[in-house]
Amino acid sequence: ILERGIGKVYVGSMDPNPKVAGKGVQILRDHGVEVQTGLLEEECLSLNEIFFRYITTKMPYVAMKYAMTLDGKIASFSGDSKWVTGEKAREHTHFLRKKYRGILVGIGTVLADDPMLNCRIENGVDPVRIVCDSHLQIPLECQLVKTAKDIETIVCYAEGNEEKQKALME
């Protein structure tokens, strides 16, 4: 900015990182650059909410997505849980998968739905797939295992047979 001779800069939100907070703005002002802060501040805070939460609390940003029927069930009367929601909700699911670094499911979801847990939005990056499976019940034939070489997948378990552990590592 200084090298290019830019005379006016707009800053939507200040960086809360204590290592840099406000220092860049001050350097620009010290060199005669007019700096206006707070332009579209709410939008900028929303855009950077994941980073801001981590940098100020050192805690991860966690979002939960849950689908249920009008009567509070997570599956239809027939037991089908794949299509409890409509098309818009499924699109939003893929937006969330694009936005967040990881997706966590329990072994029950894997056994019931055999999900891919990938992002189907153009140019979307697949989230790391994390499965909580305390007894290592994950089927070697499921979509998550079949595609684990292409999409990072973590299976968290407390116990399980050594043969299955080896097979999953391959």
Predicted regions and their residues:
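Hydrophobic, well-ordered secondary-structure segments
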Residues: V25, E41-N48, R90-R97
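Zn2+-dependent cytidine deaminase-like catalytic core
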Residues: I1-C44, V128, I154
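Active-site ligand-binding patch in enzyme domains
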Residues: I1, R53, A63-L70, I74-E170
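Short capping loops/turns at secondary-structure boundaries
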Residues: N17, A21, T37-L40, I55-M59, ...
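Proteins enriched for Cys/Gly/acidic motifs involved in redox and nucleic-acid/cofactor modification
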Residues: L39-A67
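Short low-complexity, flexible loop/linker segments enriched in glycine and/or proline
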Residues: G24-I27, I50-Y54, C119-R120
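Short, flexible helix/strand-to-coil boundary loops that buttress conserved ligand/catalytic motifs
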Residues: S13, N48, S78
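Short acidic loop-to-helix transition motifs that present clustered carboxylates
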Residues: N17-V20, E42-S46, V110-A112, Q137-P139
